[in-house]
């Protein structure tokens, strides 16, 4: 499957580190709060040091948001789920673990459209088949990369119907979990248009180096179920051939 060739255009800005690399957001924003200067809503990194260097390289262009997030960041997933047609950038620097890269693209594409930045030695075909909107080389000249990301946002906005991934509202009396990890798990289940296999959820909620263990996922699901039970709600799931599939929240 060929990679689309998109026109060049300029724009961006960055600087320090906590959950990521800071940039200077635009004063203008959409009704949902996304800065209009940034084509990309969230940057997710499989190796933070390499992505931080990329942000500094792109300092003079307005294409990336304020923070760099490591894989598994609840804050990143929450931001993506708040936007009806979000765009994430999955950066794969040299030295990142790439054995399960296609599967990572697959699970992240359930939350947003995904553009992947890769080193030259990674084949793009499997990533496109896994659901990537586009795959771009990391060594592309900064002005060209900025233009491609800007054009990607424009192309997604005009070529396909909006895929609404926003979180469905809970009944008013239900108190949301205070823990970010529990809240994100709840939001993923509430926003999903398809069932989630336990292996996919473990990968989504793990780190860049390793998925979450199935035992840890089961414990988290149990705690979430206990919070929902007083409101007459439950996590629905099926088990077949040793694999648990979570189908959402019911009640």
Q: For each predicted feature, which ranges?
A:
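Short amphipathic alpha-helical recognition elements used for nucleic-acid or partner binding
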Residues: 175-208, 224
């Amino acid at each position: 499957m060929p990679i689309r060739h998109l026109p060049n255009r300029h724009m961006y800005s960055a600087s320090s580190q906590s959950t990521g690399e800071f940039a200077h957001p635009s004063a203008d924003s959409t009704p949902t709060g996304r800065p209009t200067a940034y084509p990309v809503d969230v940057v997710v990194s499989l190796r933070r040091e390499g992505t931080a260097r990329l942000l500094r390289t792109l300092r003079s262009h307005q294409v990336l948001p304020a923070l760099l997030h490591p894989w598994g960041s609840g804050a990143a997933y929450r931001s993506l789920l708040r936007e009806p047609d979000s765009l994430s950038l999955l950066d794969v620097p040299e030295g990142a673990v790439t054995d399960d890269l296609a599967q990572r693209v697959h699970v992240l594409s359930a939350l947003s459209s995904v553009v992947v930045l890769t080193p030259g030695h990674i084949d793009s075909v499997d990533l496109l088949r896994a659901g990537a909107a586009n795959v771009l080389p990391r060594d592309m000249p900064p002005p060209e990369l900025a233009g491609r990301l800007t054009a990607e946002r424009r192309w997604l906005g005009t070529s396909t119907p909006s895929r609404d991934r926003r979180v469905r509202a809970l009944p008013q009396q239900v108190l949301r979990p205070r823990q970010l990890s529990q809240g994100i798990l709840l939001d993923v289940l509430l926003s999903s248009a398809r069932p989630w296999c336990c292996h996919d959820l473990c990968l989504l909620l793990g780190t860049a180096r390793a998925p979450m263990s199935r035992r840890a996922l089961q414990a988290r699901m149990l705690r979430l179920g206990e919070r929902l039970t007083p409101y007459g709600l439950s996590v629905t799931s099926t088990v077949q051939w040793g694999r648990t599939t979570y189908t959402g929240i019911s009640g």
